[in-house]
Amino acid sequence: MYRELISHKIAELKKERKAIILAHNYQLGEIQDAADFVGDSLELARKAAKVDAEVIVFCGVHFMAETAAILSPEKIVLAPEPRAGCPMADMISGAELREFKSRHPGLPVVCYVNSTAEVKAESDICCTSANAVKVVESLKSDTVLFVPDQYLGAFVKERTSKKIISWPGYCPSHARIKPEDIVNLKKHYPAAKVIVHPESRPEVTALADEVLSTGQMVSYAARADVKELIVGTEIGMIYRLRKENPDKLFIPVSEQAVCANMKMTTLPKLLASLENMQAVVSVPEEIRVKAVGAVERMLRVV
């Protein structure tokens, strides 16, 4: 009853504020249910760029809300939990990227969208896990600097003819997924297909039937003719997969693959955000104008 009451108040305030609620696939189930749109980083960036709402309430981690603010400076962007950060995004700063570039002059920088606005501003083009290969292939240079995720960089390197020089960052949640977990699960579910996220270690992706972004996982699960899928990504993804495919069995590779930051946003915080119009996420204009080019170039890659 309490949850229904909060959800009702959120729906009322959303109309009053002319707001849209965007949520990442790793958010709590209650947040996914309250959202107008749930997706992966690429889908959310595209939605933020074209949405006609006056207020964007972004349920994710800070860099995602920042990306919305970069793309839609005329809109109010709210983060219900402003302390929800991203450890991988914090593994490189703008100053560190400038130093990295100075050691490899003239090379283009591909920046995973899981990064700060300052890092995006120092990059030539952004990418997500869904379009990283296409983005890298779109560049004329034979050698590319890739930040901050070394494992996504390794995934791209295997699938392109480019030389990839990666920054040694990683996602702690995906790093907890071990190859032996997949091997053990396959013994119990021999008919299952294995799908994993490209932020996983190479020895994990090597065991997968498909390596997919979370958005691609949604599409794959819907059309796959198998009834059992072993899923290697952050645990929140399982909620959406089960909700949309009740006739299929989804087995997480690891219950330890949890992003605590993604779980910080709750229904009461979402309600408070709409009630108080907090916390507003903004990007300094001198950084935004540099970062928006990298994000928009990514969105133009088909």
From Swiss-Prot:
Molecular function GO terms recorded = 4 iron, 4 sulfur cluster binding; metal ion binding; quinolinate synthetase A activity
Gene Ontology terms describing biological process: 'de novo' NAD biosynthetic process from L-aspartate
Question: Chief subcellular site?
Answer: cytoplasm
Q: Which InterPro entries match?
A: NadA, NadA_sf, Quinolinate_synth_type2
Q: Which domain of life is it from?
A: Bacteria
Binding sites annotated in the UniProt record for [4Fe-4S] cluster: 86, 171, 259
Q: Which UniProt keywords apply?
A: 4Fe-4S, Cytoplasm, Iron, Iron-sulfur, Metal-binding, Pyridine nucleotide biosynthesis, Transferase
Give the residues the record marks as binding iminosuccinate.
24, 41, 112-114, 129, 197-199, 214
One GO CC term, this protein: cytoplasm
Gene3D superfamilies annotated for this entry?
Answer: NadA-like
Where in or outside the cell it occurs: the entry states: Cytoplasm
Annotated cofactor note = Binds 1 [4Fe-4S] cluster per subunit.
Entry cofactors: [4Fe-4S] cluster
The record's catalysed reaction(s) read: iminosuccinate + dihydroxyacetone phosphate = quinolinate + phosphate + 2 H2O + H(+)
Pathway it belongs to?
Answer: Cofactor biosynthesis; NAD(+) biosynthesis; quinolinate from iminoaspartate: step 1/1
Tell me the HAMAP family matching this sequence: NadA_type2
Q: Which family does it belong to?
A: Belongs to the quinolinate synthase family. Type 2 subfamily.
Q: What does this protein do?
A: Catalyzes the condensation of iminoaspartate with dihydroxyacetone phosphate to form quinolinate.
Q: What is this protein called?
A: Quinolinate synthase
